[in-house]
């Protein structure tokens, strides 16, 4: 599953006005929430068609039930193993007489008894069963075996089981089949078998689609819903005759009319390979497609709304899919396992994308690309998300993790090799370099907290769906990607690929744990006689079984290296023990005065080597191209030499390492390892820098300063400094783009141009402010002809709305409502949060929970856009505090990301009062709980304490530095 805005100018503290508006927002949004809750209450699952006294449901909490009973535990017992399923589903795309959208289905599961048992436990969620002889299922033997009679069946809601109690025991090694007929709601909750809606002209269209990961296949049909319970699936869909049915495999033949109703067709699909339930997909829609046959014979199709396909929005995805599939087939030394690769863009989809085997589902903005209206960053997102999902077709689908505690291996691997696949499809973009900014530094911000967690968690600690959901975080995706990139680097890509191919060949159609990969990589190392300080397993266990990462400190006067666990707050209490005592086996790469040196391994807390000692004006720099997952600190003299080199000729240092110098120093300053002025001094050379990565590293690092100080007197001098530094970059792009009429050829230059405009406008460069307001005014005068290049729209929209008022906001809102391309709608939706008008933000916040105005899948990100605006943060925080219980109860199982919301709304917290509010918020809502936001709340408390300390220590010196250096 794939991972995946601009902030307006500050207005300072608005005091009483903010409080009054927040109360208004609370009242307005409470009404919206009540409406949504009532709608949800009226949309509960349909009643059983044949109710019976013996068909009981157990609603008690699993924590209060007898844990000695297998059905009260979240993990399936090992007594039964599924072999195959026959599933028929019929979604109704118009509401019934109760106003509900429903689907009906039947299922036959064949399973083998591995241990004698008198109970069948299978997952089932929100399904209502048709009773047969008083029971929800019919059981029969296969191959002459005789099944015991059924005593009773029950639904255990807390653990989401259908439990079949038997009067005798199933026989070990015997096969059985179990039939059921059921009905469920085709809800708009973005989970399991659900419905998505969109407008085609003035007509509302409905799509039946799926999202099974992690634990929602059970919401579509009864199944053994764990990744290790692989089986073959025979899917049949009954659907309106004018619609198309899709699933993981191709149809066996043309659809045939349903005998009892010719308005319906029956589509039967070929049997799937042995696979996990979470990778199943089935879709009924009137979508259209474009297709081509790959050189290896695989059928490639891109599906989307007919108007999007007709406009050519699927063409780019079609053109890159074949090359990416071929790349991974070569990279894995394994042919693509299926006869076709369907990819479909859905109007409503909670994740960025989902790697369903042979039928990958996407948000529209992750698959569709319009060259006339989409930006280069939109194009980059499409190619990288496609590469991520196609990487999973082998790593994750063909070979699958045993249990979700190793999710990081699935998602971390795909998050790493997505850059390789995308780079193959777009070789001139240098996409592999972006991983440092997008993943390595992104996750280090979280992994430097005492509340972080290791990549690999013991299986016994991950049981409930909520615990599984918490694993889909930056650690699993981005740290997983970062340490695998480091592993590939010190092994060499060829050795890494050899071990990977062996792993895939050995475990095809099976399940693994992470140690299996280490063992196969070790075999490849042994075959190549590569010298490592110890085994792959020993090295990687340090990076996967303990949280965090080291900071390597270099004393160039002696050549001494030392390592310690890097914590943003060095006084924080690390309560999680580590068998390795937070010592890592670290691959060290380095350059001296621009010349690369031999590689080195730091295996102890401290070591000495002449590679790292200098004399005269020599400087040394560690972690070449940031292939290692660690930060680097130097003695004061070496820092001074690096700064001198940057200001004299920054090109002597590789561009990625120029970004590293900035990012490491700011984080070291946050951790009290270096003075904050040292980190700020590392940005002085930017007045001469034109490359994207160093500037992005600086802006990203300084965004923390903005969060801490945009409500204080520091912010004025800070803006003046940024204005001074960015003006040459702004002028450079103005002159080299014919006064913004042309776009730079190089992708990184295009991104740098956007940074130049965004930074110049938000920090008061008059020419920039005039440019964006002029372009936006031209568009307002002629709405049918947008003069703003797609690359520049996000920043122009945001800054123009920030400078404007109600007229500009209402125009942008109207354009958003009429946008037919999701990428354009996304740009406008984010920019609408840039307003300086409190009442406008208040109104916009009230829109976010009306799905007729803001799609459910976009509600969280829209609220986050508002809270990222200094003016809107108070509105959102007041609302979250006052309405958490309602928010959690109404949306806890749906499309809200509580983790992202908590992280965003607390990002500016830096006062004792805000800490007290946060602690009170936790106390007040302990009974309600925080779901997927539980860990985020603990991290928010830790970050707030660190912020308070940092501001107290640094405010005055930062104010002085910006004042002196902005002249």
UniProtKB/Swiss-Prot annotation:
Signal peptide range: none
Cofactor note (record): Binds 1 zinc ion per subunit.
Spans through the membrane: 9-32
Ranges for region Cytosolic Ser/Thr-rich junction: 33-68
Disulfide topology: 761-768, 798-834
UniProt record similarity statement: Belongs to the peptidase M1 family.
Expression induction: Estradiol and IL8/interleukin-8 decrease enzymatic activity in vitro in endometrial stromal cells by 40% and 30%, respectively.
UniProt protein name: Aminopeptidase N
């Amino acid at each position: 599953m794939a991972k995946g805005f601009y902030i307006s100018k500050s207005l300072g503290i608005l005091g009483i006005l903010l409080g009054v508006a927040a109360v208004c927002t609370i009242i307005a949004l409470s009404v919206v929430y009540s409406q949504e809750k009532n709608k949800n209450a009226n949309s509960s699952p349909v009643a059983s068609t044949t109710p019976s006294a013996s068909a009981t449901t157990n609603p008690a909490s699993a924590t209060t039930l007898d844990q000695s009973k297998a059905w009260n535990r979240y993990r399936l017992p090992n007594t039964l193993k599924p072999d195959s399923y026959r599933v028929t589903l019929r979604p109704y795309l118009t509401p019934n007489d109760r106003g509900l959208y429903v689907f009906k289905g039947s299922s036959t599961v064949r399973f083998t008894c591995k241990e004698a048992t008198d109970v069948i436990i299978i997952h089932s969620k929100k399904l209502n069963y048709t009773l047969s002889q008083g029971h929800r299922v019919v059981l029969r033997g296969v191959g002459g075996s005789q099944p015991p009679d059924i005593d009773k069946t029950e639904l255990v809601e807390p653990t989401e089981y259908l439990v079949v109690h038997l009067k005798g025991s199933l026989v070990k090694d015997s096969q059985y089949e179990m039939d059921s007929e059921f009905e469920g709601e085709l809800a708009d909750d973005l989970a399991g078998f659900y419905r998505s809606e969109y407008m085609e002209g003035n007509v509302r269209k409905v799509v039946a689609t799926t999202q099974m990961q992690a634990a929602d296949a059970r919401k579509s049909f009864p199944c053994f819903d764990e990744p290790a319970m692989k089986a073959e699936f025979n899917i049949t869909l009954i659907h309106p005759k004018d619609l198309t049915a899709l699933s993981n495999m191709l149809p066996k033949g043309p659809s045939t009319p349903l005998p009892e109703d010719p308005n319906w067709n029956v589509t039967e699909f070929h049997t799937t390979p042995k696979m996990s339930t979470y990778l199943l997909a089935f879709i009924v829609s009137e979508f259209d497609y474009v297709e081509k046959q790959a050189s290896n014979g695989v059928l490639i199709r891109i599906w989307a709304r007919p108007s999007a396909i007709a406009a050519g929005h699927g063409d780019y995805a079609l053109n890159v899919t074949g090359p990416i599939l071929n790349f991974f087939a070569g990279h894995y030394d394994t042919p693509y396992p299926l006869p076709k690769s369907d990819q479909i863009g859905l109007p409503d989809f909670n994740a960025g994308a989902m790697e369903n085997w042979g039928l990958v589902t996407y948000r529209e903005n992750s698959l569709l690309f319009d060259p006339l209206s989409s930006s280069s960053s939109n194009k980059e997102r499409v190619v990288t998300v496609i590469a991520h999902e196609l990487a999973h077709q082998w790593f994750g689908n063909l070979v699958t993790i045993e249990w979700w505690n190793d999710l990081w291996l699935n998602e971390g691997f795909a998050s790493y090799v997505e850059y390789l696949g995308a780079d193959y499809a777009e070789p001139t973009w240098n996409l592999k370099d972006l991983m440092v900014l997008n993943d390595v530094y992104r996750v280090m911000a979280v992994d430097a907290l005492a509340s972080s967690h290791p990549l690999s968690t013991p299986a016994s600690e991950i049981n409930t769906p909520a615990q599984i959901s918490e694993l889909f975080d930056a650690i699993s995706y981005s740290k997983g990607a970062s340490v695998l990139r480091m592993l590939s680097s010190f092994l060499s890509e060829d050795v890494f690929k050899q071990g990977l191919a062996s792993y895939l060949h050995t475990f095809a159609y099976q399940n693994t744990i992470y140690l299996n990969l280490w063992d196969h990589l070790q075999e490849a190392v042994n075959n190549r006689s590569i010298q490592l300080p110890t085994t792959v397993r020993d090295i990687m266990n340090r990076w996967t079984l303990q949280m965090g990462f080291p900071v390597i400190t270099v004393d160039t006067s002696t050549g001494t290296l030392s390592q310690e666990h890097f914590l943003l707050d060095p006084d924080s209490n690390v309560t999680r023990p580590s068998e390795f005592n937070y010592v890592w086996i670290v691959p060290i790469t380095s350059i001296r005065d621009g010349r690369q040196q031999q590689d080195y391994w730091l295996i102890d807390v401290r070591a000495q080597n002449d590679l790292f000692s200098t004399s005269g004006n020599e400087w040394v720099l560690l972690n070449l191209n940031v292939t290692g997952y660690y930060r680097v600190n130097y003695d004061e003299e070496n820092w001074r030499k690096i700064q001198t080199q940057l200001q004299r000729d920054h090109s002597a240092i590789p561009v990625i390492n120029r970004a590293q110098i900035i990012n490491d120093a700011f984080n070291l300053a946050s951790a009290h390892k270096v003075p904050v002025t040292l980190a700020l001094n590392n940005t002085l050379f930017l007045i001469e820098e034109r490359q994207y990565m160093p500037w992005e590293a600086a802006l990203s690092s300084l965004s923390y300063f903005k969060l801490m100080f945009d409500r204080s007197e520091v912010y004025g001098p800070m803006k003046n400094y940024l204005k001074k530094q960015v003006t040459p970059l702004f002028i450079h792009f103005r002159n080299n783009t014919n006064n913004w009429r042309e776009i730079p050829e190089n992708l990184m230059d295009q991104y740098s141009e956007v940074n130049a405009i965004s930074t110049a406008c938000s920090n008061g460069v008059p020419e920039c402010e005039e440019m964006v307001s002029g372009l936006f005014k031209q568009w307002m005068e002629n709405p049918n002809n947008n003069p703003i290049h797609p690359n520049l729209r996000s920043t122009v929209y945001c800054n123009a709305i920030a400078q404007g008022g109600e007229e500009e906001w209402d125009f942008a809102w109207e354009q958003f409502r009429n946008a037919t391309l999701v990428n354009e709608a996304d740009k406008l939706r984010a920019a609408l949060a840039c307003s300086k008008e409190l009442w406008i933000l208040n109104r916009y916040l009230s829109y976010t929970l009306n799905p007729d105005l803001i799609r459910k899948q976009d509600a969280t990100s829209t609220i986050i856009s508002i809270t990222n605006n200094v003016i809107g943060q108070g509105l959102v925080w007041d609302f979250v505090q006052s309405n958490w219980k309602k928010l959690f109860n109404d949306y806890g199982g749906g499309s809200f990301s509580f983790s992202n919301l908590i992280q965003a709304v607390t990002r500016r917290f830096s006062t004792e009062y805000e800490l007290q509010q946060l602690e009170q918020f936790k106390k007040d809502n302990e009974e309600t709980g925080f779901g997927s936001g539980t860990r985020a709340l603990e991290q928010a408390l830790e970050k707030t304490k660190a912020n308070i300390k940092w501001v107290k220590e640094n405010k005055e010196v930062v104010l002085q530095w910006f004042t002196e250096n902005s002249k």
